[in-house]
Amino acid sequence: MPVLEIDLLDETNKLLDEDKQLVENILQFAAGYLKIDEGTELSLTFTTNEGIREINREYRNKDQATDVISFALEEMGEGETEIDWADFDLETPKMLGDIIISTEKAEEQAKDYGHTKARELGFLAVHGLLHLLGYDHMEPDEEKIMFGLQKEVLDAYGLER
């Protein structure tokens, strides 16, 4: 039984079914590997360089395309009040947030790094999932932890460089 409930949207209408399935399989594997609660939800959107550039500009003030952006729902934004969900008796599934991947950037990077587009999409999906779980790579020690875990998950799945 799948651990994650994944709401997948392909805005490009160009992604192959096997690529979508691979990314879903890797995310499900990663969720099990990382012991994420069953029924946890996330949304995954595949877009173009222009689509991700608009998001990057609007939400991160960076007017350029990037490979993956994650928006964690439990991450505190500036001026927001923290909600302690333990105070509520909720039977609703936990929603991690959104992962947005540029398929064009994934293709470019796959060529640059000399591996398949599928490997790059899997890498970006796991990278995005780790961000939703609170991992980051702004500091060298954080980067070592996050990238180490990312490699561990991808290697365990069998998607190596």
Curated annotation (Swiss-Prot):
Keywords recorded for this protein, A-Z: Cytoplasm, Endonuclease, Hydrolase, Metal-binding, Nuclease, Ribosome biogenesis, rRNA processing, Zinc
A Pfam family this chain is assigned to: YbeY
Needed co-factor(s): Zn(2+)
Principal localisation: cytoplasm
Binding annotation for Zn(2+): H127, H131, H137
Assigned GO CC terms: cytoplasm
Cellular compartments annotated: Cytoplasm
Cofactor binding annotation: Binds 1 zinc ion.
GO MF, one annotated term: metalloendopeptidase activity
E.C. number: 3.1.-.-
EC class (word): hydrolase
GO aspect biological process, one term: rRNA processing
Lineage: superkingdom: Bacteria
Protein family (similarity comment): Belongs to the endoribonuclease YbeY family.
Functional summary from the UniProt entry: Single strand-specific metallo-endoribonuclease involved in late-stage 70S ribosome quality control and in maturation of the 3' terminus of the 16S rRNA.
Name by which UniProt lists this protein: Endoribonuclease YbeY
